């Protein structure tokens, strides 16, 4: 250090000093600046009381802090000087926005404003220019079935559901990797305290009784292997990991029950595939489905005699990380043949995320018998990844087929800020409010009645909203103000009906020797029950509890 160093503190010393000084400043701000600590606490109490009464499901940083500190107090990352906003899901966020603003106004607070946030379908409430909460739209059929823990009377989204958000971040290098520094440690601690089930028994799926289905699935794979912008995930990726490790023991090849793949050109590829796949058999049909929450976009399911054989998803303006590999044909567990062709399979992180998402989907569809399969699939991915890394003396961040944090990805990306900007421009052209905003003392701001896009994941029954047709209605199922809607067009009608999807419920697969055919009439009756379900995953329940359903798999005790 020279004699003329103006700042003579070393970097390691600075980090300690800065942290301590920052806490001092936070306390002084709460004591000396407006809004003060008393006002902040009053507003928080009102927001939390409302969230409790409405049984809204909390997510985000506030929720992560709750679940971590609930199990281990020193894992809390917020302290008494922090004022984090409270994020929660709601099937009617605009109703909540108005109600909360009115309550706060009645309590005498000033400068109350509710308005759209920077990311779509999310709304913020400010009091005295400070942000206190954000509410995000979640379709009712998803909302009613999202698992949660109840902590201090609050419904906190279940840690296993939170994991999806982490993997969405990991698999979104373009837009989300800047969040790593803050979230990585949180996820590691969440994984420590609320681990996914560790399963000792291997994944096994028996062959279809109709051996022709295997042949059809193999033929569909041949068609898909010729497309350059398709990324495979799910059971095909699992078998490829088995092939990669040459493992024939506990994690052996499985009979692939159906194919799952994503594309960044959903309509173009979808139209081509309908034509090409339909030529394979006159017994092949298909159905289109709405996006499923924030998790994936429009999708199409191909069926062979009513049995799902291929799930085809839109990338939903996300860039999907992938690895290019040799195309290996897995017609059944014994007929495995490598080719010289190349295909793309999802990165390890993407495959885990997809399985976690489908766990939510089968819960929404009240088809929890698939839980066992999906948890075993996740365990298989992890075990095979670890085996491959051990065989090749690699780390998970080293470049390999099973690597994490993959930057190579497929798809055009659009940021949430750009989406909101384009939405504002579209509204202005229609002479509509640029931003949905509500202030209790301005009645003119009350006059909005907004219809959210259908993201229920249900089948598209309104022909005007089909995407895989010659001339699709591009604006169908866009968010809109009610007076924009055509009188003869009810785009969201499927969202409030009983979920009658046949995409997963009709899977005729044997697992552990049990025939998994489902009776359609029984499914409809079950759906009437499930849409009224609001069950909590309390700690007194088994770790594998899923509402009333207890899965069959065995857990290794930790």
Predicted regions and their residues:
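Amphipathic alpha-helical segments
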Residues: 93-107, 265-281
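Active-site and adjacent loop segments of nucleotide-processing enzymes
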Residues: 51, 135-208, 308-466
């Amino acid at each position: 250090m020279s004699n003329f160093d103006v700042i003579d503190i070393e970097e390691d010393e600075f980090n300690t000093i800065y942290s301590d000084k920052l806490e001092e400043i936070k306390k002084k701000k709460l004591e000396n600046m407006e809004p003060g600590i008393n006002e902040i606490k009053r507003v928080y109490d009102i927001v939390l009381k409302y969230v409790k009464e409405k049984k809204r499901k909390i997510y985000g940083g506030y929720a992560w802090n709750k679940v971590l500190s609930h199990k281990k107090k020193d894992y809390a990352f917020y302290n008494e000087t922090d004022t984090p906003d409270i994020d929660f899901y709601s099937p009617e966020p605009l109703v909540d926005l108005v109600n909360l603003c009115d309550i706060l106004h009645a309590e005498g607070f000033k400068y109350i404003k509710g308005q759209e946030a920077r990311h779509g379908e999310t709304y913020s409430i400010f009091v005295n220019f400070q942000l206190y909460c954000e509410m995000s739209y979640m379709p009712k059929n998803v909302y009613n079935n999202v698992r949660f823990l109840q902590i201090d009377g609050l419904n906190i989204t279940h840690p296993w559901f939170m994991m999806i958000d982490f993997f969405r971040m990991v698999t979104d290098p373009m837009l989300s990797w800047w969040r790593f520094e803050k979230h990585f440690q949180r996820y590691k601690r969440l994984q420590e305290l609320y681990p996914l089930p560790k399963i000792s028994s291997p994944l096994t799926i028996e062959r279809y009784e109709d051996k022709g289905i295997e042949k059809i699935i193999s033929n569909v794979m041949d068609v898909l292997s010729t497309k350059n912008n398709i990324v495979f995930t799910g059971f095909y990726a699992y078998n490829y990991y088995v092939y990669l490790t040459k493992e024939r023991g506990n994690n052996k090849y499985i009979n692939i029950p159906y194919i799952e793949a994503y594309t960044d050109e959903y309509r173009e590829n979808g139209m081509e595939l309908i034509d090409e796949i339909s030529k394979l058999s006159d017994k092949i049909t298909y159905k289109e489905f709405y996006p499923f929450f924030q998790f994936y976009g429009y999708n199409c399911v191909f069926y062979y005699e009513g049995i799902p054989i291929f799930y085809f998803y839109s990338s939903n303006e996300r860039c999907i990380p992938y690895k290019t590999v040799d195309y290996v044909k897995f017609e059944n567990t014994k007929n495995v043949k490598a080719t010289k062709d190349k295909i793309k399979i999802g990165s390890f992180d993407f495959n885990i995320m997809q399985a976690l998402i489908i766990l939510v989907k089968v819960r929404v569809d009240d088809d929890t018998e698939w839980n066992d399969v999906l948890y075993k699939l996740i365990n298989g991915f992890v075990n095979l990844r670890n085996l491959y890394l051990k065989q090749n003396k690699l780390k998970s961040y080293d470049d390999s087929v099973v690597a994490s944090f993959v930057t190579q990805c497929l798809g055009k990306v659009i940021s949430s800020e750009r989406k909101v900007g384009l939405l504002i421009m579209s509204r202005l052209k229609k002479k509509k409010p640029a931003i949905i905003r509500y202030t209790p003392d301005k009645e003119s701001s009350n006059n909005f009645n907004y219809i959210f896009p259908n993201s229920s994941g249900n089948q598209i029954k309104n022909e005007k909203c089909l995407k895989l047709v010659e001339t699709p209605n591009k604006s169908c199922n866009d968010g809109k103000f009610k007076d924009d809607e055509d009188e003869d067009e009810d785009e969201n009608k499927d969202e409030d009906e009983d979920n009658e999807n046949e995409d997963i419920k009709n899977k005729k697969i044997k697992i552990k020797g049990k025939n998994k055919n489902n009776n359609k009439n029984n499914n409809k009756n079950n759906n009437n029950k499930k849409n009224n379900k609001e069950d909590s995953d309390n700690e007194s329940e088994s770790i594998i509890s899923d509402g009333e359903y207890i899965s069959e798999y065995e857990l290794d005790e930790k």
